[in-house]
Design a protein with these regions (language model features):
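Hydrophobic membrane-insertion alpha-helices, especially the h-region
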Residues: 4-20
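The alpha/beta-hydrolase serine catalytic core
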Residues: 32-63, 181-246, 290-294, 302-314
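Short beta-to-alpha linker loops that shape the active-site pocket of alpha/beta-hydrolase fold enzymes
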Residues: 113-118, 182
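Gly/Ala-rich beta-loop-alpha elbow adjacent to hydrolase catalytic centers
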Residues: 154-163
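Catalytic nucleophile-loop/oxyanion-hole region of alpha/beta-hydrolase
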Residues: 119-147
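Serine-hydrolase catalytic core
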Residues: 68-75, 222-298, 312-323, 329
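Short, surface-exposed "cap/lid" segments of acyl-processing enzymes
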Residues: 59-114
């Protein structure tokens, strides 16, 4: 028995060493520097349209775009709004809330498109990295700064994660709106993806592709299939951003909204607990941050007519944040 226990202990130790020295996943190396974009608004829109038209397999109506406050003048506005969608989604994930907010406050709106979003290629995300994932958000902010004197960034899900990163590195942002930000996924086992043997574990558990079962209309605006390399990248980015020392760097006004009714009826895509842990750690003064649960939204995606049963409530609460915290004056009354 003693020899057996010694043998068993040795085997466990050997397996532990083998796990620890297994293939590793590199840490994200994120650079906060924004890219340079033209300040000529006519040229800027043309460049966006041209680059989007060149994307192979981009599905109709998924392209990034500028929504002008005044289509006749197409000029810089006092405020601009940048919308950053979530993992594998599109601008439709925040529609119509982002458009209604932009109209109400007379703001130019930039609807960004992240790397590989909106394409029909089933291998989408096969080359996604934390660096090119974040690059899309940085370009969106650079465009937003060109479109408005002050920028408000709205992010949903993984777009909220990217928005948090932008807020820590660009304090000039006027305010951020986080709809169901993906600070951690609901199923915490994804954290294994960035541990030794993580890629192998992920491929064995999930397969090389994730395939969605969205209904036909929604599937036009969300990826139907993507490489699970994207999940690896998502976890790498969360590892880099979802940290207390990151949260305390955020000083500007923050609106946090999510779906939560009770322990059973809540967001089961991303972790509400992780959002609630983040909120008190933000460096933003208490008077400048708002946390709201939307129990009737019924879905992780709370600001889209495709998914949310209470996008109107989400919009109203965000308007109150704009009015009372950001001190923005409406220029239009929506019917």
């Amino acid at each position: 028995m003693k020899k057996f226990l010694l043998w068993t202990g040795g085997l466990v130790a050997l397996l532990a060493v083998g796990y620890a020295v297994g293939p590793d996943v590199p840490d994200a190396e994120l650079d906060p520097t924004l890219p340079t974009v033209t300040q000529n608004l006519t040229q800027l829109e043309a460049e966006i349209n041209r680059s989007e038209a060149a994307i192979p397999d981009l599905k109709p109506d998924n392209e990034a775009r500028i929504v002008w406050a005044d289509t006749a003048k197409k000029q810089k506005t006092p405020y601009s709004i940048v919308y950053i969608h979530g993992f594998g989604a599109s601008w439709a994930e925040g529609d119509p809330v982002h458009k209604n907010l932009a109209q109400r406050y007379g703001a130019n709106l930039y609807l960004a498109r992240m790397h590989d979003a909106g394409i029909s290629d089933p291998d989408a995300f096969d080359d996604l990295t934390p660096e090119n994932f974040v690059a899309g958000a940085k370009r969106a902010l650079a465009i937003g700064k060109t479109l408005g004197d002050s920028v408000i960034v709205i992010g949903t899900s993984a777009g909220g994660l990217l928005t948090v990163y932008l807020a820590t590195t660009h304090p000039e942002i006027k305010g951020i709106v986080l709809y169901s930000p993906c600070m951690a996924v609901y199923n915490s086992t994804l954290k294994l993806a960035t541990k030794p043997w993580g890629r192998q574990i992920l491929n064995r558990a999930v397969g090389e592709h994730r395939v969605s079962d969205y209904e036909s209309e929604r599937s036009n605006y969300w990826l139907k299939s993507y490489s699970t390399n994207g999940l690896m990248t998502l976890q790498q980015t969360m590892d880099a951003v979802s940290q207390p020392e990151i949260y305390k760097k955020i000083k500007m006004p923050v609106f946090l909204g999510y779906y939560y009714k009770n322990d059973n009826e809540q967001d089961k895509v991303v972790s509400v607990a992780a959002m609630k842990e983040m909120f008190p750690l933000l460096g933003t003064p208490d008077s400048l941050k708002v946390e709201r649960a939307f129990p009737e939204s019924g879905n992780h995606v709370i600001a889209s007519h495709f998914t949310s049963q209470d996008w109107q409530g989400v919009q109203y609460a965000t308007e109150q944040f704009f009015d009372k915290v950001l001190k923005m004056n409406p220029v239009a009354t929506l019917q």
